[in-house]
Amino acid sequence: MALKKNRVILITGASRGVGKGVALGFARKGDTIIITGRSLVKGTSVSQFGLTLESSLESTAEALSKIGAHPIAYQLDQNNDEEVKRLVEMISSEYGRLDIIVHSSCQIHDDLVKPLPFWKKSINMWSLVDVGLRSNYILSYYAAPLMVKQKEGLIIHISSHGARCYMHGPAYGAQKAGMDKMSFDMACDFEPYNVASIALWSGIVLDEKTELVSKNQDDTYVEFLKGGASQQYAGLVIDSLSQDSDYMRYSGKVLIMQELGESYGIKDIEGKNPRSDRSTLGGPVDFESTKVY
């Protein structure tokens, strides 16, 4: 069965980037959208890759309100397990259920896109694993009993082709590969309870950061970006997935966002089909069904 209307949805990392785009593309009138991030107040900016990016949950919340959704801007440090636990306790107390989680937070270091071997980048590149992998586990851990109790739910892990090809170095690759396998293993545990866990490779997303970075790149990179998806596209795809009466068939799978969107007949906001990068960056491989307890 498809997930109910007037959903309670939790989206992490929604102050900017993919998380913000997911929230804007996903929200429907009547939905309660709990958005988390470290930057709350409108007008807040962060520095990344030498760029200044606007980053605030209040800005995302304003846009969601215009759609008719009910946004809850919740300032959260996902390195703090107790804060994560209190968030889930608040959701349970206030709403009594949690229909969908979209894990899109990621702690990105400025060295990420430098063309250097890992030992010449900062050792703090490993923070990608702390927020983006470990954080997904902790939030899912505390939210699982609520979703199991209601016997339905959807957990989405925003992942990447970096799980299969060399991309940005071993810390990034470990995070994405770990995320895909963790999503599969969660799906195994959730199977009796009608809760799906799915990893989605987002591909190139034309968010605030990508568009600014492209101004300093060569023509090849700029051409590569032309097939990218809008910031909102992932949200449109996840919304269609949540409305699918048989969404459980995808539980445990690793899916390419653009291919899933095409299967649902979804066009991007400009009427285009974003490009799948399977042919150049590789595609997902199914995990074995064997279970060892």
Question: What do the PLM-derived regions correspond to, one by one?
Answer:
Residues 140-141, 184:
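A short, exposed helix-loop element centered on a Lys and neighboring polar residues
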Residues 199-200, 218-293:
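C-terminal helical subdomain
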Residues 29-59:
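Conserved glycine-rich Rossmann-like NAD(P)H-binding loop of the short-chain dehydrogenase/reductase
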Residues 15-16:
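Conserved glycine-rich cofactor-binding loop
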Residues 54-55, 75-87:
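The beta1-alpha1 cofactor-binding region of Rossmann-like NAD(H)/NADP(H)-dependent oxidoreductases
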Residues 6-7, 69-70, 97-98, 112, ...:
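Active-site loop of short-chain dehydrogenase/reductase
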